[in-house]
A protein has these predicted regions:
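Cross-family detector of peptidyl-prolyl cis-trans isomerase
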Residues: 2-8, 19-355
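Sec-dependent N-terminal signal peptides of Gram-positive bacterial secreted proteins and lipoproteins
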Residues: 11-17
Length: 355
């Protein structure tokens, strides 16, 4: 039988060989994520965090203004950064993920110098939406905001598809490497540094000065106005403008006399935003909709624009209505229904009966 001394010595020596003084040091993963950039041209951001590196491809061709803001802050070339890397040392102040102990995977958010979701660089800038850039998968880099055209320094990276955010948050990049880092970070994790890498002749010419940013803001504002004008033209195409400001178009003729005031009516309806997003409907327009809507015209039950239009309809008529905010839900909107403040809203309405 071996002595106790020999057994202890054997265990100790074996332990040292297996994982102690004589063990080879573990290889560091730091910098390994950079391998994904080999042979690639473009502008990339490398966020070094407590949990590892996140490598991002920045969409500098598709969203040049938003990328200029991000790069200018990261490199300290925008006035708000005061010559210092703005993001270095900031926290991911908001994390919603299973790794963080939440019930679902969503995203990580950072870029707030206050660290509580209320801070920014001291300015706000407009949205820069691009058709086809959507939250169809995880790993999308996008601007956080508190509503339309309120971008600053805060950004987020998604963990899963989040398509309900499409065209509400500007997407300006995506994860190339380190999605596992994104998925595993916990709230309060630090961005040790954010480094910008330019590869290729075109990317190397990309500058992010205050003058560049100011110029791009004007260009994007003009492009946004032109795009919105085209969208609006499509919304009211073929419509007549009522003296009240409501646009309408008769889609199907009715019979008899117009409904008028004080009538008990029943209507099928579909309510939607000018981008086509439906917020409410009855079964006549949607298989999962409600029962037809019953109300008394001019009885103060409905929004003014809707009531006014129904009064002018004939039984059997289907009419499209585009109602201005002052005759709909005003400056407040109905956020819980997805209706923003100050929004024009549309209805397709069929008058089923009027008594």
């Amino acid at each position: 039988m071996k002595s106790i001394k020999k057994i202890i010595f054997g265990l100790t020596f074996g332990s040292l060989i297996a994982g102690g003084l004589f063990a080879a040091p573990k290889a560091s993963n730091k910098g390994k994520s950079m391998d994904v950039l080999n042979g690639k041209e473009g502008i990339f951001a490398v966020i070094d965090t407590d949990g590892g590196e996140i490598v991002l491809n920045l969409f500098y061709k598709e969203t040049p203004m938003t990328v200029t803001n991000f790069v200018g802050l990261a490199e300290g070339t925008l006035d708000a950064a005061k010559g210092k890397p703005f993001y270095d040392g900031l926290k991911f102040h908001r994390v919603i993920s299973k790794a963080n102990g939440d019930g679902q995977d969503f995203m990580i958010q950072g870029g707030d110098p206050k660290g509580n979701g209320t801070g920014g660089p001291g300015y706000k800038f407009i949205d820069e939406f691009v058709d086809g850039l959507t939250f169809d998968k995880g790993g999308k880099l996008a601007m956080a905001n508190s509503g339309a055209n309120t971008n600053g320094s805060q950004f987020f990276i998604t963990i899963v598809p989040t398509e309900w955010l499409n065209y509400k948050h500007t997407i300006f990049g995506e994860v190339l490497a380190g999605q596992d880092v994104v998925d595993s970070l916990k709230q309060g994790a630090t961005m040790k540094s954010v480094k910008i890498i330019r590869q290729g002749d075109e990317a190397k010419k990309f500058s992010a000065t205050q003058a560049d940013f100011d110029k791009l803001q004007k260009e994007v504002a003009k492009a946004n106005e032109e795009r919105e004008a085209k969208k609006w033209a499509a919304v009211i195409d073929g419509c007549t403008k009522h003296s009240s400001g409501v646009y309408y178009k008769v889609l199907e003729e009715g019979k008899g006399s117009v409904c008028g005031k004080g009538k008990n009516v029943s209507v099928d309806y579909k309510g939607y935003l000018t981008d086509g997003q439906i917020f409410d409907a009855s079964r006549g327009f949607h298989p999962q909709g409600h029962e037809p809507l019953d109300f008394k015209t001019n009885g103060g039950q409905m929004i003014p624009g809707f009531d006014m239009m129904v009064q002018e309809m004939k039984v059997g008529e289907t009419r499209k209505m585009v109602i201005p905010p002052e005759l709909a839900y005003g400056s407040r909107g109905i956020p819980q229904a997805g209706i923003p403040g100050g929004a024009y809203i549309c209805f397709d309405v069929k008058l089923l009966s009027a008594k």
